[in-house]
């Protein structure tokens, strides 16, 4: 049993003993709700406000309740307890508890941090889902890093998770893509044509047209335009998706499924719309079909089918949510750009009308990213004169730095991305600082091996040799990693893992400066090698959640 859960049981047993002794009245006491790690070491290793929680039931002052609880706690798990303020109980772990936790970490090895796969929820996380009409930009990059880290975090926390990319391949944007590629293709072959005003004017479209010419030359010129556009629609979409998948793979982002919007047509879309019509939520006006979202607080009803018969984006989304639910997912998480905020009430309305619970659909909004170079905003790419792409960012700062920086901030806050800091090979750069801790550990392993030291028999290692404060602080930090994973997953907050990894690396660097591993008593060497082995396991686990590599040399 984890220390935190064991402490909760100890507290509740002490309360029951106080009840039995008549010091607390009998009543319906709720389980301990909060047992947290204090921000300052002087307040112990764990702290609870249980006495305050039970004050109303006991009809006593929280401090008096705390005194009764402490009186009936006799547990070797803790070395001492203190009552603070109005009734907080602070617990200081016994040294034997700390040593036992170190053994637990070493026993679990690389899987330490993985929680039991006993969660009932089956979760589908959909993220990025950018239109496949051009390269991914830094806004997409932020969503990609955060989304994949969230998937990794939920899996580590024991959830059944499925990652999906929704490919928008059914709308007018694909027709505009084909028209734009067609225009560039003809231009490159000497024809005087313009890219349509509603087309795509990016440099990448020229690249796609060039690749067509490189492969097929002018073979498509002999086709009539309708046939050529049909081919270009397929070829351009395939090429754009291929580039997009390559960029994401190089960014350590993978999906379990690439879901085609076209697959929803016609049956699943028709079924959803028929249900809405039958129940009176979808109505016809001015030749178009409207969903009555004002019934759920929207400022106006929304068009689903235009008067010309063309479906809106909203139309396929109405069918996509039931599709997810019917595949067995009872929790849906989407990551959208902040500009989609007004879309939330629409999709939640459609869910409610179709008989689904909107509370099962979590929508996380990501705010914009500002790239900074020399302290100044970077507006455009020097190469293309357009928005900076994910590929360009990876080429300049690397995947690891980009992912860590994106994962270290909450999605709902605007972010300044300091390119100069991300490129630094020093402790000023947080990802370098963390990776360097891992590299240092491997360097220590190499030195120990070269010195002929054998280690790894943890059952026979005497960890009571670890008496320095910096050593015990490391173990205590690692002991609460499980709690961190559980809490961060529930909060959908991979940034907490990023912060934890940085703090653990800091504790290790302090230990490295203060404690020698070689050239000391053999038992101390063995114990410290066990300690840094545990640190290495936890650091690598945390970095893997963030999608950041753990190089052995730097």
Regions found by a protein language model. Give the residues of each.
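Non-catalytic interaction-recognition regions
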Residues: 1-99, 110-554
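Short, charged, solvent-exposed linker or helix-capping segments at domain edges/interfaces
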Residues: 100-105
